[in-house]
Amino acid sequence: MQRRHFVAGLAAAGTLLATPAFADLPSLRFRDMYSRGKDLSEEAIALQGQRIVMTGYMAPPLKPEINFFVLTKTPMATCPFCDDATDWPNDIVLSYFEGDMKFTRFSNLIRVEGTFDTGIETDGPTGFVSKVRLLDTRYTIL
């Protein structure tokens, strides 16, 4: 084996190892989440309980000690806070994480992996009402 082929093979292997593990998961785009108004699409309903990937932006956290962030379709300098499910925007997803997570700048495009969950729920400590969520979330900056 020639040295340059060996080095090229090492570089290719490193690229494969650096590829996120969630590359093979189903993805859901914000525009495909709802069919009409505030009704979830068939695609979104079919993904209930599955690990999925979404791409968007992390809105600034409500408080530094919370265990979730809001994934948004477009960058937002302030966090959208909803106190009623009827006000739930169709371009945000509440994203819960376990343990500590480093928040990123609101203008960084991120790819998020989590278990897709639907239904109206209220976060006890904050009172934040959500219609869709990602559970056990992790992200990478794109």
What are these regions (language model features)?
Residues 5-23:
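N-terminal export signals
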Residues 22-142:
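OB-fold and OB-like single-stranded nucleic-acid-recognition modules
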